[in-house]
């Protein structure tokens, strides 16, 4: 990278190319239909716009909108805990996809307010293909490590090597990273002596 904070893209792929145009359109129509059901259910939640984001390799769907402020996010989180909005719609989305014969698309919880939808096999472990185990000690911190969470597969993959950590938020993430860095610095100083 040329400057701090910049990155080098090492791989790019497309969900639409992987599953095909027709399946991709079916996925999008299903997401839009499910969003309409959430609106029609008249939950006491705000809708802020920007509900869908095509990230190339996946679709991110946020029922309240990706641009929601913190107050709106907290309102949705409370309602989701009480009514299980996202759990219901994960199950409904899966049933609808299976009824259409689409078995190669996955939906998982993403963060506190959204879903991630991607081709089967393209969970976060997909990135490890670009970092051979012999060359990298990949560590992972995630907030959705349970079975329906978008961090689950990578968390489980690295957990047996003590290289994955579940976090409750940004403050704990900083603590986890600080601990990992301090352990690494301790190992380096042992090697130097």
Segment roles from a protein language model:
Residues 1-50:
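Active-site phosphate-binding/coordination module
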Residues 1-6, 18, 114-117, 170-175:
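A short acidic, often aromatic-flanked loop/helix-cap motif at beta-alpha or helix-coil junctions
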Residues 11, 108, 165:
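General small-molecule cofactor/ligand-binding pocket signal
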Residues 19-23, 84, 88, 168:
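Alpha-helix boundary/N-cap detector
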Residues 23-27, 88, 92, 127, ...:
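Exposed alpha-helical structural elements
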Residues 27-43, 89-101, 180-184, 188:
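Hydrophobic, Leu/Ile/Phe/Ala-enriched alpha-helical segments that form helix-helix packing faces
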Residues 42-139:
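Conserved acidic, metal-coordinating active-site core of Asp-based
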Residues 118-193:
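Mg2+-dependent phosphoryl-transfer enzymes with acidic/Ser/Thr/Gly-rich catalytic loops
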């Amino acid at each position: 990278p040329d400057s701090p904070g910049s990155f080098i893209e090492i791989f790019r792929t497309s969900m639409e190319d992987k599953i095909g145009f027709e399946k991709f359109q079916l996925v999008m129509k299903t997401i839009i239909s499910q969003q309409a059901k959430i609106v029609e259910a008249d939950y006491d939640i705000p809708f802020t716009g920007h509900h869908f984001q095509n990230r190339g390799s996946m679709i991110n769907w946020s029922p309240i909108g990706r641009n929601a402020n913190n107050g709106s996010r907290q309102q949705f989180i409370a309602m989701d805990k009480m009514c299980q909005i996202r759990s219901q719609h994960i199950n409904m989305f899966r049933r609808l996809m299976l009824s259409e014969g689409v078995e190669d698309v996955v939906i998982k919880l993403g963060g506190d307010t959204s879903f991630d939808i991607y081709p089967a096999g393209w969970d976060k472990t997909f990135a490890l293909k670009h970092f051979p185990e012999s060359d990298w000690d990949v560590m992972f911190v995630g907030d959705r490590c349970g079975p329906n969470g978008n961090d689950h597969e990578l968390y489980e993959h690295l957990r047996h090597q003590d290289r994955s950590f579940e976090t409750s938020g940004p403050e704990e993430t900083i603590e986890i990273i600080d601990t990992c860095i301090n352990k690494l610095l301790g190992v380096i100083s042992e090697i130097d002596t």
